[in-house]
């Protein structure tokens, strides 16, 4: 399998997210990079599923809650930006205040 750097990065984010969702299911609280990876993967997969930028911007705010992450993490993440592939091309999706 031959992947370019962007494809490798997307695959790494997806794999990290799958591992981290298992940790979350076991009740472990997520740290900063773990929370960012899960929300980023949610955005990228949502785009592949045909969701719009507006939908992902809103739904991205409900992927994780304060109870899912370590203390202080919500305050560290003002917004998350992810480049996602939509049916009509690649777009930048920004989720403001993603952890409520």
From Swiss-Prot:
CDD domains xref list: Urease_gamma (cd00390)
Cytoplasm found in the keyword field: yes
Gene Ontology terms for molecular function: nickel cation binding; urease activity
Catalytic activity: urea + 2 H2O + H(+) = hydrogencarbonate + 2 NH4(+)
Domain of life where this protein originates: Bacteria
Record PTM: Although not discussed in the published references, Met-1 is represented in the submitted PDB entries as being modified by either a formyl, a carboxyl, or an acetyl group. The N-terminal is probably N-(dihydroxymethyl)methionine, the hydrated form of N-formylmethionine.
Gene Ontology CC: cytoplasm
E.C. code: 3.5.1.5
Alphabetical UniProt keywords: Cytoplasm, Formylation, Hydrolase
Pathway: Nitrogen metabolism; urea degradation; CO(2) and NH(3) from urea (urease route): step 1/1
Entries under Pfam families matching the protein: Urease_gamma
InterPro entries: Urease_gamma, Urease_gamma/gamma-beta_su, Urease_gamma_sf, Urease_subunit
UniProt-listed GO biological process terms: urea catabolic process
EC class: hydrolase
Disulphide bond pairs: none
Compartment annotation: Cytoplasm
Similarity annotation: Belongs to the urease gamma subunit family.
PANTHER family according to UniProt: UREASE
Subunit structure, as described in the record: Heterotrimer of UreA (gamma), UreB (beta) and UreC (alpha) subunits. Three heterotrimers associate to form the active enzyme.
HAMAP family associated with the record: Urease_gamma
Descriptive protein name: Urease subunit gamma
Gene coding for it: ureA
């Amino acid at each position: 399998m031959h992947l370019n750097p962007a494809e490798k990065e997307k695959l790494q984010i997806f794999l990290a997210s799958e591992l981290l969702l298992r940790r979350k299911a076991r009740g472990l609280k997520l740290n900063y990079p773990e929370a960012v990876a899960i929300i980023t993967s949610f955005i990228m997969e949502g785009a592949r599923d045909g969701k719009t930028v507006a939908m992902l911007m809103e739904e991205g705010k409900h992927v994780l809650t304060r109870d899912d992450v370590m203390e202080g993490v919500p305050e560290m993440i003002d917004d998350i930006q992810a480049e996602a592939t939509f049916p009509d091309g690649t777009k930048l999706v920004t989720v403001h205040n993603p952890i409520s």
